[in-house]
A protein has these predicted regions:
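A conserved beta-strand-loop-helix scaffold within acyl/acetyltransferase catalytic domains
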Residues: 2-65, 116-233
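Acyl-donor binding region in acyl/amide transferases
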Residues: 63-134
């Protein structure tokens, strides 16, 4: 079997052209991270004879806290990478990239966290071998196809929505930079009071919206009352 080569990229200017359609592992998101204050992206690429067969993207996030340690860095990874050659075991490729990434960032990060794993057992052996441990989180699954939105809502929620509409509350897409900025500032103030919650830098949302303007894969919706933004998503 031909040897697999692992490369680490930290600079978007030298990123090669890579296959794939996954946003968490895309070159576009890599460059967005680069432009966001406090964010440093890392891309691990596995290749054979210069042909990419897998990639795994991570981001190192710098956090400033009120209590010691006042400055910490944590590495976050969404998913388990993207794979392009079915002749190789995804779990084995993941294990190689996981070990490489762990050795690369552990010396500078307080914590390495994987989120949005496809299954609870994927890569379990490799996680254990590299010193990772599972954390239980509440997962909520909503089917978007079995029932219409109106039928999925509880009667109490329907009454709340109808009452809000009656008093003039409106929902619309935030198309102007001013509306998006106002809403993001509102969210940031809400998250700032929650010690265990993190709100990403505002630039990250703005860059995501700009980069996906044509595809509309990242959109902001706002709720207004008397021409004042009171919520959104």
């Amino acid at each position: 079997m031909k040897p697999i080569r692992l490369m680490t990229y930290r600079n978007g200017s030298i990123l090669p052209t890579l296959p794939g359609e996954s946003l968490p592992n895309s070159s576009e998101l890599f460059r967005i991270y680069e432009q966001t204050p406090g964010y440093s992206p890392i891309l691990i690429v596995a290749s054979i004879e210069e042909q990419p067969i897998a990639k795994l993207q991570a981001v190192i996030r710098r956090s400033v806290r009120l209590f010691p340690p006042s400055l910490i860095k944590r590495c976050e990874i969404f998913g388990t990478g993207e794979y392009f050659d079915t002749t190789y075991s995804q779990e084995e490729l993941f294990g190689m990239m996981l070990e490489h990434l762990t050795n690369e960032v552990l010396k500078e990060c307080f914590l390495i966290e994987f989120r949005n794993l496809p299954t609870a057992l994927f890569g379990y052996k490799h996680f254990r071998q590299n010193g990772y441990f599972p954390v239980n989180w509440l997962r909520v699954y909503n089917s978007l196809h079995s029932l219409s939105p109106e039928k999925r809502l509880e009667n109490k929620r329907k009454r709340q929505i109808n009452r809000a509409l009656k008093y003039g509350v409106t929902l619309q897409e935030a198309l102007s930079e001013e509306d998006r900025s106002t809403f993001l500032q509102l969210l940031k103030r809400n998250y700032s009071s929650k010690l265990r919650k993190h709100f990403p830098a505002l630039e990250l949302f703005q860059l995501l919206t700009e980069e996906s303007r044509e595809e509309k894969s990242a959109r902001t919706f706002i709720v207004k009352y008397r021409n004042r933004i009171i919520g959104g998503s």
